[in-house]
Amino acid sequence: MSRISQIELDDRNLPPPTPEIEQERKVAIFDLIEENSFVLPKRDERDVPEGPYHLSLSIREKRLVFDVQTEGGDKAAEFHLSLSPFRQVVKDYYQICESYFTAVKTLPPSQIETIDMARRGIHNEGSRVLQERLEGKAEVDTDTARRLFTLICVLHFGG
């Protein structure tokens, strides 16, 4: 199965992330590189270069850009996704993450667990939206979609 072997976020124009967001980002990238599934389907009867792939994620002109290259540096694909379908779920995810980070410092474990369950539910929704938006462009499994959604959140809210 094809996979992502390297990932880069184009965050040059973003403010520095908070320590919590930077940690989430590092974990998502590490986990993504360790295990993922990323397949470029055949399009218009044209063959697609085989992976592993290098993926660059960026936001350009209010669109999420997936720039996919082979390990040899050849262009494998590039696709642009509207950010509109992600706006509400990203906003909800950040709000629940703020609550979670605050709860970890002050609340008992039972309340932290409740907030964490809500956080996971919103994260799952974001990964589902991503899988839908990637349909016909790239095939990703649920864990890969979850990790990519985390990175989209970092880009979407600018750290």
From Swiss-Prot:
Q: Which InterPro entries match?
A: UCP032146
Q: Does the keyword RNA-binding apply?
A: no
Q: Which UniProt keywords apply?
A: Plasmid
Q: Which domain of life is it from?
A: Bacteria
Stretches for region Disordered: 1-21
Family of this protein:
Belongs to the UPF0262 family.
> What protein is this chain from?
UPF0262 protein TM1040_3562
